[in-house]
Each structure stands twice: as structure tokens, then as C-alpha cells.
Amino acid sequence: MFITFEGMDGSGKTTTLLKVKEELERLNYQVLITREPGGEAIAEQIRQIILDNKNRDMDAWTEALLFIASRNQHLQKVIKPALEKNIIVISDRFIDSTSAYQGSARNIGVDVVNQVQQIVLKNCLPDLTLFFDVSFSEAEKRMQIRGENSKNRLDEEKSDFKQKVYQGYLELVKNNPKRIKVIDANQDIDQVYNQAIKIILEKLKENEKRTSN
């Protein structure tokens, strides 16, 4: 099964991902956790270009295509091989990030970005996506705790950009209710984790029941 975690920076998705992996492994599932951009040697090199603070003058389409190129490398070399071995793959970001950040916030257009992604990625979709919905104030507070030195080029975007990203995510949730489930990420990390693991275990049971019939 292929699961993705989506949301604004500071939503707690990365911390929750690690806790979910620990619990699934306790239940004897094989789990691979990975991230985007990156998750593979070449994809990680592309990540450095995308997030480098020196590259502030990057064109919106250049940014989008770099994300998609990194994603395809990650998909072909890491995600697909793991899925073929029946390993549960959980990725910190995937296609919905590009739809929200570049399609919505960069004003390229979600439909156009998704058309390119469908061509390159051959319409590969996650089985389940969790959207970690957090308020701007809570996200900013968590980002400050992370420290100034951890900020990358996208972290430093202005609030109007982040608002567009958030609205882009809400539109994705609205248009993909079966695949994308919302997590209230304003709560403390244990409550956020409890929401996430409940949804994931239900999906796993659903898949196991379907394959056994």
C-alpha cells in the first residue's frame, strides 16, 4: 500500500510519520518511509537545487518541473520496487504538494500541473493521503521552534503564498474525498498520531479484506 502525508510545513506530519512507522512495524508490517523532494540519490541532488536559498529567482515552471523530475526518479527507483515487494510505503509529500505549491500558489494552474504529472508518472496515485490541517499561527510557532537555520527557500515564502498553498490543499481535499482524509493537526502530537494511525489501520484492513476475497 502506498500512503502519502501532505500539509503545510509545521503541520507535524513528519513527526507523525515516524510514530506511524514504529507502530506498523510493531504490528509486523514491512514499512518504508521516504520523503519528497528527495528520497533517492539523484532526487536528493535535485532537492538541493529546489530548496537552496540562493535560487530565489527560479521560474515557477522550472520549479514545478524539477519537483516532477525528482518525483519520477523517486517513484521509479524507490517507491515502485518497494510496492512490488508488498512493503508499505509512506512518503512525506507526493503529487499533491506540487498541485498545491506550484499549481495553486505559483499560479501555474492545478489542472495543467496535474496533466504533466499524469504523463510523467503514468497516473500513479497513492492509495491513501492524509492531509494535516493546521492553523497558520500554530504552524508558524512550530517553525520558530525548528529554528532559523532550518529554513529553506520555500519556508521563507510570504504569508500570501502560504495562504494560496493552503487553499490549494483544501481544493484537493474537496475534489478527492475518497483518497484524501483530513487530520486535525492543531492538536498535540499524540492526538494527531491517534487520528492518523486509526485511518491507516482501517485502510489496511479494507485492503486485506479485498485481497482475501
From Swiss-Prot:
ATP binds at residues 7-14. It catalyses: dTMP + ATP = dTDP + ADP. Signal peptide: none annotated. One of its GO terms (molecular function) is ATP binding. Keywords: ATP-binding, Kinase, Nucleotide biosynthesis, Nucleotide-binding, Transferase. One of its GO terms (cellular component) is cytosol. Disulfide bonds: none annotated. It holds the Pfam family Thymidylate_kin. One of its GO terms (biological process) is dUDP biosynthetic process. Its EC number is 2.7.4.9. Phosphorylation of dTMP to form dTDP in both de novo and salvage pathways of dTTP synthesis. Belongs to the thymidylate kinase family. This is Thymidylate kinase. It comes from Mycoplasma mycoides subsp. mycoides SC (strain CCUG 32753 / NCTC 10114 / PG1). The gene is tmk.
